[in-house]
Amino acid sequence: MKIAITGHSAGIGQALAKIYAAQGHEIVGLSRRNGYNIRSIPKLLTMIEPCDMFINNAQVGFAQTELLFAVYRSWQGKEGKKIINISTMLTSAPVSSLPGLEMTEYYVQKQALEETIRQLRHLRNWPKLCLVKPGGVATQPDQTSPRPYADVDHWAATLIKILDAGPDLEVEEIALGVNYP
């Protein structure tokens, strides 16, 4: 299978890319480090279109949602295509519990992504959409916090096992990780 992943050079994207590559899948890695900015949607789309699965992981402003629309539009009606969208468990918490305006902005951007996925699902057409909401995941090697974090490689391996549940099962939404208080 050919899999495109935004934000593949660090954190969750890197862990998923590593595992899928080890399983023999062809990875199309898209990140700023290799010249693919998530805001350059036409450029990204040319790399994503020939793939079977797209992991919509990188997030800058509302570009993640805009890219979802572009890929969905391009893949509409094409059987076998799947888009995995990475959000956050933070969206399950009240906005008043967030530590500041920067986190509130991130929260609103992820809420927009999640609502877009829910609305696109009503079209009941290909591509299939999956929403993944990580809890606390240690995405940096030296990450420390008073809160517990899941190991990113273990988290990614667990997610892939769930996503590979079989052809007769469709996974629409996953909340996976250490939940935020």
Spell out what each predicted region is.
Residues 20, 44-56, 79:
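A glycine-rich helix->loop->beta "capping" turn
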Residues 122-150:
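Flexible, glycine-rich beta-alpha linker
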